Design a protein with these regions (language model features):
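Ligand-binding pockets and gating/stacking loops
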Residues: 1-247
Length: 247
């Protein structure tokens, strides 16, 4: 399992320093004193493990990643290029990557368009186009695109036909996603839908294949094993293979 960071999520509040530097220093000195006493009691090495987590916590709230959330440190022209809403989240994601974050997730809801899809897409579409284009261009200009993989995906596709309410319902057999950067071969469309836009026309590309492609970019062994909740060994990715057109 992984714990992606959502730049617009609740965890952001826990990363902000709520006291001044002097009070933080005083608290840290008190904690060091308590830890010294605890080490005298505990000789089994448990405290050494806790120390590393405490240090990570201090590093998190004091590191330059904090500035990643404050767009006043960004060039106003860049902020304007990204736009509001999703654009602000995309920009914070880029700044987090620059600050050392290895995995950032942005959740952008509002796509469950069972009715009124035309009006909803007229609002949603341009915002996504602007933010995504700005991020890709920005990463490229900063020399970060080759080492950063952008994955844009939903949970599933939508029905090929418009329903009676002017919307589209859930549709699992076919979906569309986009990838950019990460050293993959860009500028192409992979896969094709059948005539009725309901199933893949040629070979299907599965979620496991997508994960295998991401693992390839990250140079992770997709065949690594772990023990599942039933206590049985299983592969991280059971059947997926990297998408050959991209790697």
């Amino acid at each position: 399992a992984y714990g992606p960071f959502d730049p617009a999520g609740e965890a952001r509040r826990n990363m902000a320093l709520a006291v001044d530097q002097q009070r933080l220093s005083n608290r840290r000195a008190m904690l060091d004193g308590i830890d010294t006493l605890r080490r005298d009691i505990d000789r089994k090495g448990l405290m050494e493990g806790l120390d590393s987590f405490e240090q990570q916590a201090f590093n998190l709230i004091l590191s330059r990643s904090q500035q990643a959330f404050d767009l006043k440190f960004e060039d106003p022209r860049v902020v304007d290029r990204y736009g509001k809403g999703l654009g602000e989240q995309m920009l914070m994601a880029r700044r987090l990557c620059e600050a050392g974050a290895g995995f950032v997730t942005i959740n952008y809801g509002g796509w469950d368009m069972h009715s009124g899809i035309k009006q909803a897409m007229d609002q949603r579409g341009p915002e996504v186009d602007r933010a995504v284009a700005a991020l890709i261009e920005d990463l490229d200009q900063r020399g970060m695109l080759e080492n950063t993989l952008l994955v844009i995906s939903g949970e599933f596709g939508r029905t090929p036909k418009i329903n009676g309410s002017g919307g589209r319902d859930h549709w699992a057999p076919l979906s569309t996603l986009a990838l950019a950067g990460g050293g993959l071969r860009m500028g192409q469309v992979v896969g094709e839908s059948a005539e009725k836009v309901d199933v893949p026309k040629t070979r299907p590309i599965t979620p496991q294949d997508l994960l295998a492609t991401i693992f390839h970019v990250l140079d992770f062994d997709r065949r690594v094993q772990f023990t599942n909740q039933s206590g049985r060994p299983t592969y991280m990715i059971e059947n997926g293979r990297p998408i050959e057109e991209l790697v």
